[in-house]
Amino acid sequence: MNMAPTLATACASLPPEGALAPRGGPSALMTHGTALIMAGGTGGHIFPGLALAHALRERGWRVHWLGGAGTASQPSMESQLVPPQGFAFESIDFSGVRGKGLGTLVRLPWRLLRACWQSVALLRRVQPDVVLGLGGYITLPAGLMSVLLGKALILHEQNSVAGMANKVLARFATRVFTAFPDVLPNGHWVGNPLRAAFLQVPDPATRFAGRAGPLKLLVLGGSLGARALNDIVPRALALLPPQARPIVTHQSGARQIDALRANYAGAGVQAELTPFIDDTAQAMAGADLVLCRAGASTVTEIAAVGAAALFVPFPSAVDDHQTSNARFLVDQGAGWLKPQSELSPEWLADMLQKTERIELMGRGLEAKKLQKLDATHKIVAACEEVVR
């Protein structure tokens, strides 16, 4: 497995699914519109946005990206990931308010007014034909100002519980798309935009044919890692007899790789440990079981691959949206859900020892039934409709 050294490798398998071909041969590469994509804060907003950005550019669009700049010591994720992909990166001075204290709330009206003023200047300079919002605090002021200036606003909500910005903007939007059903009153359920690699994986029955020996466990902590998983998984494995342990690949995030190595060494357990995984689609496909959080992109990718997953939602996620995301699959028999407060080394060791490969294949098949693969195509088509 090729392990990547930086966050940017998570974009390696772009362009996205559908890889919409330019229309009408060489002449179709002529620019026929300008899109401003608004997304930032987390990979759950950024990676679907990048999938759409590549698809639009392949169709001849100019693409600008609006995100947060972050700080000199801690730049935003989007400011690191987007420019290397060749898209013009713009930023305004605005940040989230949840959990920031009373002082931040008191200053919110002034900060929002300033961000709206900056957004107007940006929109007049870029002159987008379509403004495409994918959630995150940064989308609120620019989305409101795009409506005020008469721009077409298209939204995509990645989670099963809509964020504040999309809840506000949805009532003014030209079109609204969602990754899960019944999220917004006027939303069209299309799934999440996916990178191409997730569409090139054999189905679960083909992958599991002929598999034997120890189970293969893939632990995904995400770009920032999941400390609870990093602590509990090595201890759970240590409770199993060596011959009953699965073959483990554990991805921790760069900040926690040293602590993870110490945890496994202390438990006396062997595993493949890495801060990042270059090809997540192939890693999921090669595993019998995936142990992970339940961010929107992860849940969508699990369904696209048809992988059996044990979801441990991040307990501090806004509106507990990760639990809701996971239930979309789990309620259909496509995985397991275990709250972090209930996850213990003893429970996990027992689960790993009792679970058979045939059951894991079945869970993967159920997940595959819930895949939605044409989100990029439908959203790009909507962008093109509004400029005709």
Swiss-Prot record:
**Location in or out of the cell:** Cell inner membrane
Disulfides per UniProt: none
Q: In which pathway does it act?
A: Cell wall biogenesis; peptidoglycan biosynthesis
Q: Name one GO molecular function term.
A: undecaprenyldiphospho-muramoylpentapeptide beta-N-acetylglucosaminyltransferase activity
Give the domain of life.
Answer: Bacteria
Q: What is its EC number?
A: 2.4.1.227
Its record classes its membrane topology as: Peripheral membrane protein
Q: Which Pfam families match?
A: Glyco_tran_28_C, Glyco_transf_28
Give GO cellular component annotations, separated by semicolons: plasma membrane
GO term, biological process aspect, one: cell division
Q: Which residues bind UDP-N-acetyl-alpha-D-glucosamine?
A: 42-44, 159, 195, 223, 277, 322
Keyword annotations from UniProtKB, A to Z? Cell cycle, Cell division, Cell inner membrane, Cell membrane, Cell shape, Cell wall biogenesis/degradation, Glycosyltransferase, Membrane, Peptidoglycan synthesis, Transferase
From the UniProt record, list the reaction(s) this protein catalyses: di-trans,octa-cis-undecaprenyl diphospho-N-acetyl-alpha-D-muramoyl-L-alanyl-D-glutamyl-meso-2,6-diaminopimeloyl-D-alanyl-D-alanine + UDP-N-acetyl-alpha-D-glucosamine = di-trans,octa-cis-undecaprenyl diphospho-[N-acetyl-alpha-D-glucosaminyl-(1->4)]-N-acetyl-alpha-D-muramoyl-L-alanyl-D-glutamyl-meso-2,6-diaminopimeloyl-D-alanyl-D-alanine + UDP + H(+)
User: Which NCBIfam families would you find in this protein's record?
Assistant: murG
Describe the task this protein carries out: Cell wall formation. Catalyzes the transfer of a GlcNAc subunit on undecaprenyl-pyrophosphoryl-MurNAc-pentapeptide (lipid intermediate I) to form undecaprenyl-pyrophosphoryl-MurNAc-(pentapeptide)GlcNAc (lipid intermediate II).
Q: Which PANTHER family match?
A: GLYCOSYLTRANSFERASE, UDP-N-ACETYLGLUCOSAMINE--N-ACETYLMURAMYL-(PENTAPEPTIDE) PYROPHOSPHORYL-UNDECAPRENOL N-ACETYLGLUCOSAMINE TRANSFERASE 1
- What is the similarity comment for this entry? Belongs to the glycosyltransferase 28 family. MurG subfamily.
Q: Under which name does UniProt file this protein?
A: UDP-N-acetylglucosamine--N-acetylmuramyl-(pentapeptide) pyrophosphoryl-undecaprenol N-acetylglucosamine transferase
